[in-house]
Amino acid sequence: MDWSIVEQYLPLYQKAFFLTLHIAVWGILGSFLVGLLVSVIRHYRVPFFSQLATAYIELSRNTPLLIQLFFLYFGLPRIGIVLSSEVCATVGLIFLGGSYMAESFRSGLEAVSQTQHEIGLAIGLTPFQVFRYVVLPQATAVALPSFSANVIFLIKETSVFSAVALADL
């Protein structure tokens, strides 16, 4: 076997690997934050924003990533918003991943008993402290397997970015 061909293209593979890693890491971190925010809004039923969060989750989960990327890359420039292909890929991954992470967080939040919340309030914690120190750690522990599945899913979805001018992938 002639390994000189592999040697010749190795720098391109390295560049593609690090680009994929860069987009995936930022996309996963952004998805985690968006998912937490959206799930808290839905769980605590914040008026108007709860319905908006539900619409976001349904729209994001029920449209393919490729369609979302085409909208970001080809649709937004028609209204004057031009983003680089890397930014489009990252935003698209955050948009998609945020909805999946939100559902994971929501399942974790619903798994925590209401009694835990009441006990936190009874010992003098503020509602935010109850959420931060009592509810969130338990919800995160329950949702951890789902988070890892979502991370794997998001890394696999980076292969779609080659359709939107990320030819390095």
How would you name each of these model-derived features?
Residues 1-168:
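Transmembrane alpha-helices and adjacent helix-loop boundaries
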